[in-house]
Amino acid sequence: MTNIRKTHPLXKIVNHSFIDLPTPSNISAWWNFGSLLGICLIIQILTGLFLAMHYTSDTTTAFSSVTHICRDVNYGWLIRYMHANGASMFFICLFLHVGRGLYYGSYTYFETWNIGVILLFTVMATAFMGYVLPWGQMSFLGATVITNLLSAIPYVGTNLVEWIWGGFSVDKATLTRFFAFHFILPFVIAALAMVHLLFLHETGSNNPTGLISDSXKIPFHPYYTIKDILGLLILILVLMILVLFSPDLLGDPDNYTPXNPLNTPPHIKPEWYFLFAYAILRSIPNKLGGVLALVFSILILILFPVLHTSKQRSMMFRPLSQCLFWILVADLLTLTWIGGQPVEHPFIIIGQLASILYFTIILFILPIASMIENKLLKW
């Protein structure tokens, strides 16, 4: 008799995705982040659901409803901080997942990669709208500043911003619609993640060497299920240390002040995971130019398959490209640091240089280095 997991229509899908899936035998811990992102999404949806049961999306009561969750709801503080820090863990996993894709040339799977970029944009949009919901001072000003960027779009900009706001300023209508979108988008992300997996399973996973691994594949279960559980335990450990020991480490103290349109904090800055993009935005004095640079700083990921000039897929055997990759990582860390600094003398020029370096490495230096490597290897 055939096993039910191979015959039952539903169990068959799960079987082909997580149990009998042929997987390369040499994939490293860098391949753990896909499953960790799935776990992060589940944690965020569950904690978010329980928060939504107690939250009110009205400008007069939003801030106090969050206070009520933290003080009066059973384990409300735990749910709230798991949700807030869960977002940080989500982005850490996302950045590492994308970095892995860049390093090992996974972007040659066009459909999987492009859906991944769309996923990145969707997660960023969701996180931004979630940050507005507590209606603290930084929430309010973040919403005002970031939505205002759309006014840089020629001709339709101002109308577009007022349409998004639902009025002439960030107010009750804005908060309500942000809550609605913040609630629905994680489910859109889950659906997109399924499409992401669908396309990935058409081709099979890449591996550190970038070579075809059809000759040596092993079943996903038990080998990689065990490996993923280890990753999960580390993720939960780090998240819970963050939540239980320093839940406000990554937050902004200004967000403990209720939003006041008449008062502006000296430094407006987003959450840490947007700082690199924020630094690129600020490094261009022109509003429209800044917005374009901001969008292109992430949209540039779509160009990687086109810019790939090497005869090898992975960077595993390409020391020159490896060196440039780590310079790019250091550059992104520099941008993240600059994004959190005030707009003053040394920081402005550092931010501008780091932004120029970011685009130059990706668009020019990496493709040229790959060609040089081809020449050196006489390919």
Curated annotation (Swiss-Prot):
What does the note under cofactor report? Binds 2 heme b groups non-covalently.
Q: Which residues does the annotation say bind heme b b566?
A: H97, H196
Output one GO MF annotation.
ubiquinol-cytochrome-c reductase activity
- Protein known as: Cytochrome b
Other notes on this protein?
Answer: Heme 1 (or BL or b562) is low-potential and absorbs at about 562 nm, and heme 2 (or BH or b566) is high-potential and absorbs at about 566 nm.
Q: How does the record describe its quaternary structure?
A: The cytochrome bc1 complex contains 11 subunits: 3 respiratory subunits (MT-CYB, CYC1 and UQCRFS1), 2 core proteins (UQCRC1 and UQCRC2) and 6 low-molecular weight proteins (UQCRH/QCR6, UQCRB/QCR7, UQCRQ/QCR8, UQCR10/QCR9, UQCR11/QCR10 and a cleavage product of UQCRFS1). This cytochrome bc1 complex then forms a dimer.
Q: How does it sit in the membrane?
A: Multi-pass membrane protein
Q: Which GO terms describe its biological process?
A: mitochondrial electron transport, ubiquinol to cytochrome c
Q: Does the keyword Electron transport apply?
A: yes
InterPro entries registered for this protein in UniProt: Cyt_b/b6_C, Cyt_b/b6_C_sf, Cyt_b/b6_N, Cytb/b6-like_sf, Cytochrome_b, Cytochrome_b_C_euk/bac, Cytochrome_b_N_euk/bac, Di-haem_cyt_TM
- Organism from which the protein derives: Spermophilopsis leptodactylus (Long-clawed ground squirrel)
Where heme b b562 binds, per the record, is at: H83, H182
- Keyword terms, alphabetized: Electron transport, Heme, Iron, Membrane, Metal-binding, Mitochondrion, Mitochondrion inner membrane, Respiratory chain, Transmembrane, Transmembrane helix, Transport, Ubiquinone
CC cofactor: heme b
A cellular-component GO term for this protein:
respiratory chain complex III
